[in-house]
Amino acid sequence: MKTVIFAGGLGTRLSEETELKPKPMVEIGGKPILWHIMKLYSYYGFNDFVICCGYKSYVIKDFFYHYYMHSADITIDLKKNDIEYHSATSEPWKVTLADTGLNTQTGGRLKRIQKYIGNEPFMLTYGDGVSNVDIPALLEYHYRHGKLATMTAVLPSGKFGALEISGDNKIDSFCEKPQGDGNWVNGGCMVLQPEVFDYIPDSDYDSCIFERAPLENLAKDGQLQAYKHTGFWKPMDTLRDKTELNEMWNNGSAPWKVWK
């Protein structure tokens, strides 16, 4: 089964980082967040990826084209124009890098890579957040309910600490990062049947936002199910998010690192 990853956005709230690279290439622990996302799927045996590139797509293509070199010590013989690799580590991944346009919306990006999916079910997620979603459990749930689409639903944490204050203004408890307002939100990690492509227009699809009409119509037709994930999930939307994720990684307490 293929895993599609949206990786074409501009990442305007991370402008200090994304002037030179696309948002999915912003690093956590010295590796792009895209790599961390792929490692989760790979841990569960899913190694066939389709990356929907857009903004500065050449950065993503260069990373994977030279992946073997990035992960090894090398000896370069300039006279012979020869490179010797030492103790290189690689991944069992097959990666299709598709340029889906600079300003294309998510529905258009998905429609543009339909030719790489064929008539098979596939998974879809975003290239700017990490989680510890149990992928086999997600798939089992998807096939059990039999609908066309499953979306992982998450409860995002609040941005600020929460205080419980008694009548005399005494603080009875303090919670550093409680859950947000109690509303479930789209956490990515979707499983989709190929019929989902029928919900995206066949023409003028570049302006189609997948999270609008396609998903809304799937919901109206009773074909969209939620897989509730109460474990770790965190998007990297701001420099603060990037700092927090790097601190988790550097402290050896990254909940999304399920691999060894």
Predicted regions, residues:
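N-terminal glycine-rich phosphate-binding loop and ensuing alpha1 helix
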Residues: 1-62, 66, 97
